[in-house]
Amino acid sequence: MTSDQETRVLAMLSAFEAGKKISELDTASGSVSDMRIEVLDTDGESKVMNLSEAVTTAANAVCGRYWNESNSTYRAAGYHGSLDMLRKLPELLGLGCYLVQDDRTRRKLDPTNHYRFEDGTPAKLDGTMGQYMWCWNIGFYFAEWKVGNLKYYAVSLSPIKGKQCVYIPAGGLSALGGGVMDRTNNILCSVVSDAAQYRGGNNDASRDGTYRTQLGMVATNMQYRNFSTYARKRGEGWDANWYVAQAVVEILFMIIFGTRNMQEAVIAEKDSNGLYQGGLGSGTTNMPNWDQWGYYPVVPTSAGIELGDGCGETTFNVLKEDGSLHYAAKVPVFFGLKHPFGHIWKIVRGLIDNVGDEKSEVYVAPSLYAGYDDNSISGLIKVCEVPRTSGYIKQKSYYLLCAMPTEIGATASTYFCDYFWENSASSKGLRVRLSGASALWHVCGGVCYAYEQCGLVFVCVCVRSPLLFRCGSGDVGLKRKRKTERGKERSLKFCIESFGKAVRRVSELAVRRVDFCDFFAGFG
């Protein structure tokens, strides 16, 4: 060892011996907002962080994904916020299938077997024990923002600091991806049954017993308003595919899987960070000669149940009249939700496109609970304008959860990968959105597909509308982090308790460096 090296070693030894344990340090007298701590960042390097911000971040976790819009890839460039929260987000939100009563009380089904409850007792999906629904079991906040060329989508259980957020109460929609009609009582359901009372399609009994049977299928061929009317007969909080639910599926898929392309191939393994990757496969989007079935449903409501609350795809074989195979239909499943895209179009309620001479303006209803007159835009909220030309979607707006395209110019393998269809040049007036495409639309028919050509009295054999419910009440609106008096009391109580825990935790550590995650591990 050289003399210079020896001098430096002695200096380090002297500094080490002069160091103090945290419990031996003088009590700080400055403002918490001015204090800083050393943290170990995700890149493994030591960084500095404001103490007050660190406490807030630990208490109000947020997670999301971001896309670099300087390139056209549909895959996220990275994750935002808490990696651990992102890993656990499906569990945290309670994503999966439940049996739901008309008063909206719900009981969780076994995540691997939907014919029994979580406690192991038998469950029936025929409506006798409740409606078979896919739910997010707790409310959450959503925000989107842009920094430079980076576009962020994030969720949290509390308002995201400094961002405009939309609060989404707990709710759910039909686990089947479509609604089933109780033909006896004229009420929209979500059940799995081959009984004539729940015959699908247009209720054509002449198809019973044939290869084109509509027994056990979702209902189609009804007017836009009727789906809603029959759903609302269940009571407060029920409707048919309210636009919020459509947005929830899109948002959560993008954030959890890190892709805007739901039709990307299924990848069973998680990535190196323990996050979901890939997509849900092609779905039921490329059936040949569908006209032989009259464009009615071909995949029964029982298909896909075997995956439980899983993600991926399963296969249902569509047979010809002679019993031979016609088409191996792929059924995509998103944490138990069947057909988030493909098979049969979904009509979206609560959202109107006003197609005028010069522009097409999109409006949303401010509340599911209030009266909604779809013959007028009076009382509705303008959220965006959509393109006046059809094409693949390059940009979308999620302002107030409208989930509508604002720019085209992509392809089937870039940006959002899905198509926007409109006909403003030849037709004007109020229009509704069809989403998810059908069994004919191939690669352009993913969850983000938007079809804006249908009037309010539109009826089609290939259009469905899933039953939906929402818990809580209140209007759609942006929220910033404003504390009520009660919220201030709760926040003050949390700060006192958390800071007390922090002090006790720090006093136990006889080290000069503190890992950020270790430091806050005991905060709760």
Listing of model-derived features with the role each one plays in the protein:
Residues 64, 247, 269-302, 344-353, ...:
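C-terminal, surface-exposed recognition/capping segments
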Residues 515-518:
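Intrinsic-disorder-associated, low-complexity terminal segments enriched in Asp/Asn/His/Tyr and depleted
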Residues 41-45, 140-142, 178, 351-352, ...:
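Acidic glycine-/aspartate-rich tracts in secreted/extracellular proteins
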Residues 36-57:
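Short, surface-exposed terminal/edge motifs of secreted or surface/virion proteins that either
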